[in-house]
């Protein structure tokens, strides 16, 4: 009788353990699915925000470029115009990064590619930050 009791209790313990392991696996898979869904949502929101910022920045740059086109330009204005055009091209290349990277990296070795992207980052960020600063400064002057 004691042996049957021990076997029955052992069987119950083993089945309870198997069920808890199965539940743990299910909860882990459900958690993974939820994490993936939330990451997709975050990426979607980030892409929408980035798209909106790019659109607004392109519009501001086009407006700024049109003001330089309509008036007489000095050498400094011409240089600013060239930088704005470069920024516009870089922003357009963000829409199609594979094609832009393919065009720019043909025939370069890895070190030249790394230097190219570093220069490109500087070329994008410098004028963009300067332009945004100038626009905000102009707005503050007009408001004040």
UniProtKB/Swiss-Prot annotation:
Maturation-removed propeptide residues: 19-43, 74-123
Origin: domain of life: Eukaryota
Residues bearing the modification Leucine amide: 143
Family per record: Belongs to the bombinin family.
Compartments where located: Secreted
Signal sequence range: 1-18
Modification Asparagine amide, positions: 70
Gene Ontology annotations for the cellular component aspect, listed alphabetically: extracellular region
Lineage: Eukaryota, Metazoa, Chordata, Craniata, Vertebrata
Keywords tagged on the record: Amidation, Amphibian defense peptide, Antibiotic, Antimicrobial, Cleavage on pair of basic residues, Cytolysis, Fungicide, Hemolysis, Secreted, Signal
A Pfam entry, by short name: Bombinin
GO biological process: defense response to bacterium; defense response to fungus; killing of cells of another organism
Name this protein carries in UniProt: Maximins 7/H13
Biological source species: Bombina maxima (Giant fire-bellied toad)
Tissue occurrence: Expressed by the skin glands.
InterPro entries noted in UniProt: Bombinin
Function: Maximin-7 shows antimicrobial activity against bacteria and against the fungus C.albicans. It has little hemolytic activity.
């Amino acid at each position: 009788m004691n042996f049957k009791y021990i076997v029955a209790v052992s069987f119950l313990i083993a089945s309870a353990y198997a069920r808890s392991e199965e539940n743990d696996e299910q909860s882990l898979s459900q958690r993974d699915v939820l994490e993936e869904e939330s990451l997709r949502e975050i990426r979607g929101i980030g892409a929408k925000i980035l798209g909106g910022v790019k659109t607004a920045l392109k519009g501001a740059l086009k407006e700024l470029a049109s003001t330089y086109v309509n008036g007489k330009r000095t050498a400094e204005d011409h240089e600013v115009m060239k930088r704005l055009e470069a920024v516009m091209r870089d922003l357009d290349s963000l829409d199609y990064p594979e094609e832009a990277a393919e065009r720019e990296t043909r025939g370069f070795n890895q070190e030249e590619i790394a230097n190219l992207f570093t220069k490109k980052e500087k070329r994008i960020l410098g004028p963009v930050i300067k332009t945004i600063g100038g626009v905000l400064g102009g707005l503050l002057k007009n408001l004040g």
